[in-house]
């Protein structure tokens, strides 16, 4: 029941946005909204397009997907993440107040951070004349896998130099 109510809320928010901005309430836009809600975690526009074609058997042009994503960003249903120079990642944002990720500087692996410490810290921050809706935090470093590879490579170099 709660999921259905939340889905109805999202559709209502999107419909209100379209009406208030004099935009067409097309089936394609609502299908993109539905697909975005079914995506797990971060996704690219190309991945959303592929999902629409392969999982929902709904064929849209990439341009329609991109323009619908733009509308979903503008009304706050999606949030965009510029995590690399390659492309923008999107995430379903409705009802969320924080987006926290650890990003490996070597391989680019992106992992969600589930620690609530940041949430508690942000909740006590005073922001005069600003009521914040959400926040994003990106922590960059080297993941355990890349650290092991680096250590292994360093050991090989040291062993080679000893000979």
Could you tell me what each predicted segment is?
Residues 36, 65-76:
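Basic amphipathic alpha-helical segments that dock to polyanions
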Residues 44-57:
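DNA-recognition alpha helix
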Residues 38-44:
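Short capping segments at the starts of secondary-structure elements
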Residues 26, 44, 64:
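Ser/Thr-centric signal marking residues that sit
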Residues 77-163:
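Non-DNA-binding regulatory cores of transcription-related proteins
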Residues 1-38:
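Intrinsically disordered, low-complexity serine/threonine- and proline-rich regulatory segments
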């Amino acid at each position: 029941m709660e999921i259905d109510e939340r889905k109805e809320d999202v559709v209502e928010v999107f419909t209100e946005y379209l009406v208030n901005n004099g935009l067409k309430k097309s089936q394609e836009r609502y299908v993109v909204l539905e697909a975005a809600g079914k995506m797990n975690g971060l996704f690219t526009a190309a991945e959303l397009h592929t999902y629409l074609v392969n999982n929902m058997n709904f064929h849209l042009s990439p341009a329609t997907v991109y323009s619908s994503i733009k509308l979903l960003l503008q009304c706050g249903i999606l949030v965009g993440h510029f995590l690399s120079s390659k492309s923008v990642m999107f995430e379903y944002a409705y009802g969320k107040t924080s987006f926290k990720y650890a990003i490996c500087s070597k391989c680019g692996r992106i992992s969600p951070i589930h620690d609530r410490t940041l949430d508690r810290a942000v909740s006590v921050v005073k922001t005069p004349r600003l009521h914040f809706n959400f926040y994003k935090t990106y922590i960059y470093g080297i993941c355990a896998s890349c650290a092991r590879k680096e250590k292994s490579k360093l050991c090989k170099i040291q062993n080679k130099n000893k000979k």
